[in-house]
């Protein structure tokens, strides 16, 4: 039996975004953060994230919580990025989007 340990609802997405000014792909999002796939790894745990949520542009401060390589044959990495502090507009916009999902 599999138990869901996450406390926040999340939504699968496939959207291009920027992490520290470099291209990455957003694969899922929750109120706490995002799951991102990229070909590169940031130099620091603290990153700047630029993304669009429900046609609104946001620049957020994030902290990389974990990194995993998808496959030895591919040069893609998955990163879990936590958003410790988000603007109220981001929280409201994402909350509306998640409630409709």
Regions found by a protein language model. Give the residues of each.
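Surface-exposed connector loops and short turns at secondary-structure junctions
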Residues: 40-44, 48, 92-93
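Short, solvent-exposed secondary-structure boundary/capping segments
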Residues: 34-38, 70-83
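Residues located in well-ordered beta-strands
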Residues: 25, 61-63
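Hydrophobic core residues within well-ordered beta-strands of beta-rich domains
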Residues: 13, 58-60, 77
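N-terminal helix initiation/capping motif
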Residues: 1-31, 95-101
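Short conserved beta-strand and strand-loop elements enriched in small hydrophobics
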Residues: 15-19, 44-58
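Short, charged, solvent-exposed linker or helix-capping segments at domain edges/interfaces
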Residues: 73, 89-96
């Amino acid at each position: 039996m599999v138990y869901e340990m996450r406390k926040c609802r999340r939504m699968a997405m496939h959207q291009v975004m920027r992490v520290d000014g470099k291209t990455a792909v957003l694969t899922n999002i929750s109120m706490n953060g995002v799951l991102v796939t990229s070909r590169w790894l940031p130099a620091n745990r603290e990153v700047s994230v630029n993304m669009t949520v429900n046609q609104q542009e946001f620049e957020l401060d994030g902290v990389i919580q974990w990194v995993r390589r998808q496959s030895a044959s591919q040069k893609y990495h998955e990163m879990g990025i936590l958003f410790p502090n988000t603007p109220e507009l981001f929280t409201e916009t994402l909350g509306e989007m998640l409630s409709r999902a």
